[in-house]
């Protein structure tokens, strides 16, 4: 009567088996003590030997039927067939020797019972080839112990027959002394044996029939094969042989050993300090095989040691270099990658485990601030490490570290710009005067672009992403810091001698322009447009991505182009104006963009194309064409003009008295090499985009005689010339080789008046 571990001991279960054992052993003992001695002397000594052998055989089979495993199937795990527990049908059919046998789902053991298997309600187990649960042996009778139960019945029946028979012999021989003790005890044993003889003999006969027919008690009672064919029968002889002589079926449930494991695990399986407190391993067996679930409970010591372990189990951070030192391999920045850094220090605070994949935060000052009078070190005086370049202090700010673009990309790279000359400085000063005067008179404020002579190399935008235009301490880039740098670079800062400023190379510049030292901005001689400090804009684009910044820049360029076109239209159809042509390109291509990435973005017409057009009556006035062509030749020869003529022209412009030419004319000497604009240009367009027209409304007056003698001008009637306004008719050359004019020369006297704030006005009298 095996019991599963953990089940409680119930005394009521052992009353039948204890009674059966007591009656069996007690009656047999009394028989051997009081009856067998006389039978040995009177009948034969073989009588006690025979009864003794049968009695031992009964006890052996009784013990085997009681304590042997009947063939219990182990229960399924809680999670083994969890889905099948809800979706499985109640029955399944299997084919046994060509006959369909139904299997039922066991809700307790969580599997389909095999054929001839049944769940015992007393033992609460599924037993293979379940016959019945016998209370006299306190065990289920199944495949593994049915043989011993059957032999117990046979031997017990034989023993009871022998006890009753030999006891009857003894009583018949002692009939005159029934009151004697021996006769009374023999009669009591016969009564007990006779009392149990009828059921035992009946039960033995019943099982003999079941064995010969190959059935079990459960199948016979339930009537499974009552009207059909039993697929499990082997014939009469085969069935008896299978029950008595077949090998013992295997056992499916193995109880865990009660003794602790003698073998002790050593490293690397367990740590040495936890061997003493390690819990025993638990091994679970199932019908599907051995399950490798070695569950080990965690002891308090192991949990304490887990608390002592560091939580940061990630890869270690790279070693820190000494502050202010850079490796030998970090001296030259790579020109192919975008270089940007905010701090020259390489030390960073320790990174927590949850932030170990974020960029390091430098602990030193970001970008050193220098006043207007201080000098800031340029990129040529500082060598940056590779890791300092790429470890930006951008936690949530966009990174401007853009890669170089190919010609098919967003923007094209440009060749390095030529060095500035003195003509750039003077031409910039003259344009500053004309721009301020035009702005005072109500004209549109248009950003002046650097003028470039024909045939010269294209000038890239300087000062757009200069070293002094880096983001401030928190790493944000503002609209003003991108377009209006605060302080010139290329100098040293006495306030911060040890800190360096990292340079930023724009993706729109040529790679060859990275290593060039920054050029100082042109000094303007205008008292109005001098350098004045400007507060940065409060609006900042801190958390914008590259795409948004590019769209903002494109919109700014589009607005600039529209403003240029409006200014051009106003100058074409206004009363008076000033025309500054970057080169002698055709006006017909003014609104067309360049096909190549290196071509100019906008092309404006020259003076000869503008005057020779249909609106200017070039076809109807050949003299006007001759005058304008002379101006174009003077413009193309402007870079070769000597500095003496340039200074003379500047002196004439600044003279307080009358000067040659009207206020609407400009000397061709001004068409020199390009100079940087007062307002930075957009990096999206690098061609010679022209500031086409700056118009001023000036009253006209007759010119002086000196102007008549020195510079013969193109005279136009006061009303219109060939249907055009007077301002457009005065587009002839201001200085050039004398030639015949198209109409009588018109002479005006120009006076120079100084206004408020140092502004100089040119008034025609």
UniProtKB/Swiss-Prot annotation:
Ranges of compositional bias, category Basic and acidic residues: 301-311
EC code: 2.3.1.225
Region (Disordered): 290-386, 447-542, 630-747
Domain named DHHC: residues: 104-154
Transmembrane regions: 14-34, 53-73, 149-169, 191-211
InterPro entries, alphabetized: Palmitoyltrfase_DHHC
Composition bias type Polar residues, residue spans: 333-348, 639-655
Biased composition (Pro residues): 671-680
Active-site residue list: 134 (s-palmitoyl cysteine intermediate)
This protein's record includes keyword Transport: no
Keyword list, A-Z: Acyltransferase, Golgi apparatus, Lipoprotein, Membrane, Methylation, Mitochondrion, Palmitate, Phosphoprotein, Transferase, Transmembrane, Transmembrane helix
Phosphoserine modifications at: 337, 606, 627, 675, 682, 725, 743
A molecular-function term among this protein's GO annotations: protein-cysteine S-palmitoyltransferase activity
GO terms classed as biological process: peptidyl-L-cysteine S-palmitoylation; positive regulation of cholesterol efflux
Membrane-protein topology: Multi-pass membrane protein
GO cellular component terms attached to this protein's record: Golgi apparatus; Golgi membrane; mitochondrial membrane
Lumenal side: 35-52, 170-190
Spans within the Cytoplasmic topological domain: 1-13, 74-148, 212-765
Primary subcellular site in the record, as a coarse category: Golgi
Modified residues (Omega-N-methylarginine): 441
Family: Belongs to the DHHC palmitoyltransferase family. ERF2/ZDHHC9 subfamily.
Protein's job: Palmitoyltransferase that catalyzes the addition of palmitate onto various protein substrates and therefore functions in several unrelated biological processes. Through the palmitoylation of ABCA1 regulates the localization of the transporter to the plasma membrane and thereby regulates its function in cholesterol and phospholipid efflux. Could also pamitoylate the D(2) dopamine receptor DRD2 and regulate its stability and localization to the plasma membrane. Could also play a role in glutamatergic transmission.
Name of the featured protein: Palmitoyltransferase ZDHHC8
Gene name tied to this protein: ZDHHC8
């Amino acid at each position: 009567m095996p019991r599963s571990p953990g089940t409680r001991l119930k005394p009521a279960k052992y009353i039948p088996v204890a009674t059966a054992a007591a009656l069996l052993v007690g009656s047999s003992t009394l028989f051997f003590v009081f009856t067998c001695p006389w039978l040995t002397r009177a009948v034969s000594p073989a009588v006690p030997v025979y009864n003794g052998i049968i009695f031992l055989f009964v006890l052996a089979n009784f013990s085997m039927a009681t304590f042997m495993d009947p063939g219990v199937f182990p229960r399924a795990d809680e999670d083994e067939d969890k889905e099948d527990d809800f979706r499985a049908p109640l029955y399944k059919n299997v084919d046994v020797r060509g006959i369909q046998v139904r299997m039922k789902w066991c809700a307790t053991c969580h599997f389909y019972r095999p054929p001839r298997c049944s769940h015992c309600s007393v033992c609460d187990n599924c037993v293979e080839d379940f016959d019945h649960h016998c209370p006299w042996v306190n065990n289920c009778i199944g495949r593994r112990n049915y043989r011993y139960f059957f032999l117990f019945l046979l031997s017990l029946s034989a023993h009871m027959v022998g006890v009753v028979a030999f006891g009857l012999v003894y009583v018949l021989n002692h009939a005159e002394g029934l009151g004697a003790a021996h006769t009374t005890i023999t009669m009591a044993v016969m009564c007990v044996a006779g009392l149990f003889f009828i059921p035992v003999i009946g039960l033995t006969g019943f099982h003999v029939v079941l064995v010969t027919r190959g059935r079990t008690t459960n199948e016979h009672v339930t009537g499974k094969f009552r009207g059909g064919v039993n697929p499990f029968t082997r014939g009469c002889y085969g069935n008896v042989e299978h029950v008595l002589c077949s090998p013992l079926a295997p056992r499916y449930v193995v109880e865990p050993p009660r003794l602790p494991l003698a073998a002790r695990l050593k490293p690397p399986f367990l740590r040495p300090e936890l061997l003493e407190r390690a819990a025993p391993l638990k091994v679970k067996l199932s019908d599907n095989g051995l399950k490798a679930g070695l569950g080990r409970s965690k002891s308090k010591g192991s949990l304490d040691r887990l608390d002592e372990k560091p939580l940061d189990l990630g890869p270690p951070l790279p070693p820190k270099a000494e502050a202010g030192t850079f490796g030998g391999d970090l001296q030259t920045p790579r020109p192919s990658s975008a270089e940007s850094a905010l701090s020259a220090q390489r030390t960073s605070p320790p990174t927590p485990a949850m932030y170990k994949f974020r960029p390091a935060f430098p602990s030193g000052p970001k970008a050193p601030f220098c006043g207007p009078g201080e000098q800031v070190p340029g990129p040529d005086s500082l060598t940056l490490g590779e890791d300092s370049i790429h470890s930006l202090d951008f936690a949530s700010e966009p990174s401007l570290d853009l890669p170089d673009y190919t010609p098919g990309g967003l923007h094209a790279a440009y060749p390095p710009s030529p060095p500035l000359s003195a003509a750039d400085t003077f031409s910039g000063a003259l344009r500053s005067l004309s721009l301020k005067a035009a702005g005072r008179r109500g004209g549109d404020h248009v950003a002046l672009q650097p003028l470039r002579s024909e045939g010269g190399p294209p000038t890239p935008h300087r000062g757009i992403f200069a070293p002094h235009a880096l983001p401030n301490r928190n790493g944000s880039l503002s609209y003003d810091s991108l377009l209006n740098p605060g302080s010139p670079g290329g100098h040293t800062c006495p306030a911060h001698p040890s800190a360096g400023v990292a340079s930023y190379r724009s993706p729109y510049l040529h790679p060859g322009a990275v290593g060039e030292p920054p050029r100082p901005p042109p000094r303007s001689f205008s008292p109005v447009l001098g350098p004045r400090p400007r507060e940065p804009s409060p609006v900042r684009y801190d958390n914008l991505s590259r795409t948004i910044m590019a769209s903002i820049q494109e919109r700014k360029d589009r607005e600039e182009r529209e403003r240029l076109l409006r200014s051009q239209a106003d100058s074409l159809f206004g009363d008076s104006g000033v025309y500054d042509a970057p080169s002698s390109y055709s006006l017909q291509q003014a609104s067309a963009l360049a096909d190549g990435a290196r071509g100019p973005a906008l092309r404006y017409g020259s003076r000869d194309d503008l005057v020779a057009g249909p609106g200017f009556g070039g076809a109807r006035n050949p003299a006007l064409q001759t005058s304008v062509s002379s101006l174009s030749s003077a413009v193309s020869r402007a870079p070769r003009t000597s500095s003496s003529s340039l200074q003379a022209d500047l002196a004439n412009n600044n003279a307080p008295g009358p000067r040659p030419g009207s206020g609407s004319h400009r000397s061709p000497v001004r068409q020199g090499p390009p100079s940087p604009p007062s307002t930075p240009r957009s990096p999206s367009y690098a061609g010679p985009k022209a500031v086409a027209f700056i118009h001023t409304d000036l009253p006209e007056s007759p010119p002086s005689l000196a102007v008549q003698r020195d510079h013969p001008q193109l005279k136009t009637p006061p009303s219109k010339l060939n249907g055009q306004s007077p301002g457009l008719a005065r587009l002839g050359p201001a200085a050039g080789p004398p030639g015949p004019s198209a109409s009588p020369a018109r002479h005006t006297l120009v006076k120079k008046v100084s206004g408020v704030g140092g502004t100089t006005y040119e008034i025609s009298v």
